[in-house]
Amino acid sequence: MIMRQASVQRSTSETDISVEIDLDGGGQAVVETSIPFFDHMLTLFSRHGLFNLTVKGRGDTEIDDHHLVEDMGICLGKVVKDAMGDKTGMVRYGSATIPMDETLCAVTLDVSGRPYLVYHVAFSAGARAGEFDLQLIREFFKAFSDHSGITLHINLFYGENNHHIAEAVFKAFARALSMAVSIDSRIQGVLSTKGCL
């Protein structure tokens, strides 16, 4: 079996990030971004998607977390794209609906090579989890979609607790991506009538 692993390093005047992923891992995570709540979300992503993930990142968080969170989306998008390779045998589509107590969220995606984000998640105005600005979650997923080439739809049906909403989003994302990148031996080549993705 081909090893579906990749790594990326990105250094700018604002951030310094390294990310490694194994799409066929067991959900092992080492995540150090200096943003505790974001570390928690990325660890959830690893565990519930069964991806092995190593993330190390630092940035100008004395200003705010925006640059680091967005650049982390760029890096995660790149490693997922690289790890998928030519997408031979891949299921391609993934969807998951996840409850978190009073919250219900669905993520549906297509590893089509066409980046597009639909994000229907509303946090209460000025919502934070600890010191983390929850509006940055959208910026993370936009950067991820743009750099992975994945069409990504994230829909919150309902929810009241902001922490629960964020967790449901990341868990559903993990499960949907895990489904989409899974291999089906019945698929010859890639799952497209065009012959490429």
From Swiss-Prot:
One Pfam family this sequence matches: IGPD
One term under GO cellular component: cytoplasm
Keyword Isomerase assigned: no
Pathway: Amino-acid biosynthesis; L-histidine biosynthesis; L-histidine from 5-phospho-alpha-D-ribose 1-diphosphate: step 6/9
Localization in the cell: Cytoplasm
Entry GO MF terms: imidazoleglycerol-phosphate dehydratase activity
Top class in the EC scheme: lyase
Regions that span the bilayer: none
An annotated GO BP: L-histidine biosynthetic process
Superkingdom of origin: Bacteria
Reactions catalysed according to its record: D-erythro-1-(imidazol-4-yl)glycerol 3-phosphate = 3-(imidazol-4-yl)-2-oxopropyl phosphate + H2O
Keyword set, alphabetical order: Amino-acid biosynthesis, Cytoplasm, Histidine biosynthesis, Lyase
EC numbers for this chain: 4.2.1.19
SUPFAM superfamilies attached to this UniProt entry: Ribosomal protein S5 domain 2-like
UniProt keyword annotation of Lyase present: yes
UniProt main location, coarse: cytoplasm
InterPro entries assigned: IGPD_sf, ImidazoleglycerolP_deHydtase, ImidazoleglycerP_deHydtase_CS, Ribosomal_Su5_D2-typ_SF
Similarity remark: Belongs to the imidazoleglycerol-phosphate dehydratase family.
NCBIfam families reported for this sequence: PRK00951.2-1, PRK00951.2-4
Name of this protein: Imidazoleglycerol-phosphate dehydratase
Native species: Syntrophus aciditrophicus (strain SB)
